[in-house]
Every structure is written in C-alpha cells, then in structure tokens.
C-alpha cells in the first residue's frame, strides 16, 4: 500500500531557490507511466510537463484559475485589471502555488490513432474502442475513463514525489474548455485540460489549525460495507 500520503501537507508556496534534479522528475514520470494500469492498454490521456522555464505560462494559468473562481462564485470577471483588484481584496487561493511551482503538469484527454498489434487485430475482428473516437458519445465515454486513469497516474506520481521529499498539489479550479486557454501561451495543448498538478519543494504550508478544522468525511460516510439481509 502507498503510505507516502500519510504525512502529506498542502504547499501554499514553493521554494523558488530549490532545484529538483530533472532526472528525478523524469524517473518519477516514467515509473508512473510504467506502473499505472489502463483499460485495454490505451492510456487515453496525455501529461504536459512544464518545467522551470515556463514562468510566464504558470503566471497565466494562475489568472485563468482566478477567473474561473469568480465564475464558480457567480460573479464572472474576465477583465485582467478587474481580476487584479479582485485578487487584492480576497483571500489568496491555494492554487496561487502554481506561480512558484518548479514543475506544473497539465493532464488532457488523448485520442489513440496508432493502436498496438493486439488492439488492431481486435479492431479488424469488429471491436470498437471508445479511446479512438474523435467525437460523439464514445469520445465522452473515453473522457470519463480518462479522468479515472489520470487519477491513478497522478496518485502514483505523487507517491513517488513524496517519497523523495518533493511536494505536490492538485488543482481543478480552471477553465475546462480549451478555447479559454490563450494559444500564445498554451499552443502545446491539443485537448481540454482535465487536471493541473504542481510539483516543487514547499516553503510555506497550510496551517495545522486550518487542517484540523477541515477533516475528511467519516469513514462510514464513504465506505459502505454491505451486509447480506437474511
């Protein structure tokens, strides 16, 4: 069992003077790719890795997240100057750590165009795989599967990072439509973003007192041990 999350702390800010060896991130990503199972071995997602040199893109991501926050709260703000004013008058969001993260991962859906030998043999025999659909209900079905597998990959990756003394966080407060991500900064994206993950060495963490007031739901609320009715 992966116990690396036992001492997990939410990093509100990362140490910009601390440098993670690129090979450590590369090895963690490769191990996650190798160890994460996938339905029919399609892995219907892509992980876009932004390193230290992508400071402008990370800054832009922060403002995209903040704009999405205003939308979620029923007060949509798209003007950047108005967003800056909003930023000054509201509590700093947890996803502010995107700006200082050494690495940021953006997960998107991936459509398979080059099936492996076994997959192709089954396709020739009449099998239809939703992971190869380019639109319609089947692509949406593959998207749901991608969400699940992204969770599995990101958990494996997080466990490896935490085991190496590297902090991580997850962000879902961002525009879910690719058209809202400016091409001048995010031309590498080829599908709607599904998850953002930050990676680095934390310099400031969520207060223990806040954490104590924010427990998970009770075990019995989440896990239902079904008993046979006689």
Listing of model-derived features with the role each one plays in the protein:
Residues 28-34, 105, 111, 121-182:
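Small-aliphatic-rich amphipathic alpha-helix that forms the alpha element of a beta-alpha
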Residues 69-78, 184-210:
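A glycine-rich helix N-cap at a beta->alpha junction
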Residues 116-120, 173, 208-209:
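A short secondary-structure junction signal
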Residues 42-45, 163, 167, 194:
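Short secondary-structure junction motifs
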Residues 112-115, 204-206:
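Short, acidic Gly/Pro/Ser/Thr-rich loop/turn segments
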Residues 1-104, 109-110, 114, 225-230:
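N-terminal amphipathic, basic helical "cap/leader" segment at the start of enzyme domains
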Residues 208-230:
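Phosphate/diphosphate-binding glycine-rich loops and adjacent basic-rich segments that engage nucleotide
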Residues 93-96, 183-187:
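A generic local secondary-structure boundary/capping motif
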């Amino acid at each position: 069992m992966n116990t690396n999350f036992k001492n997990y702390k939410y990093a509100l800010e990362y140490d910009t003077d601390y440098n993670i060896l690129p090979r450590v991130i590369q090895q963690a990503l490769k191990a996650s790719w190798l160890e994460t199972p996938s339905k029919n071995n399609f892995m219907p997602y892509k992980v876009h890795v932004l390193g230290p040199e992508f400071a402008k893109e990370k800054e832009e991501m922060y403002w995209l997240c903040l704009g999405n926050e205003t939308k979620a709260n029923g007060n949509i703000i798209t003007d950047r100057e108005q967003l800056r004013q909003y930023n000054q008058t509201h509590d700093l969001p947890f996803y502010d750590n995107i700006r200082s993260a050494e690495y940021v991962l953006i997960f998107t859906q991936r459509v398979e165009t080059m099936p492996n030998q076994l997959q192709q043999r089954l396709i020739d025999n009449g099998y239809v795989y939703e992971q190869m659909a380019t639109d319609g209900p089947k692509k949406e079905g593959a998207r749901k599967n991608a969400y699940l597998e992204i969770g599995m990959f990101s958990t494996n990756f997080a466990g490896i990072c935490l085991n190496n003394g590297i902090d991580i966080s997850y962000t879902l407060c961002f525009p879910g439509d690719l058209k809202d991500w400016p091409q001048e900064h995010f031309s590498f994206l080829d599908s709607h973003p599904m998850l953002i993950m930050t990676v680095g060495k934390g310099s400031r963490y969520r207060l223990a007192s806040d954490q104590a007031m924010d427990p998970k739901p009770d075990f019995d609320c989440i896990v239902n041990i079904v008993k046979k009715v006689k």
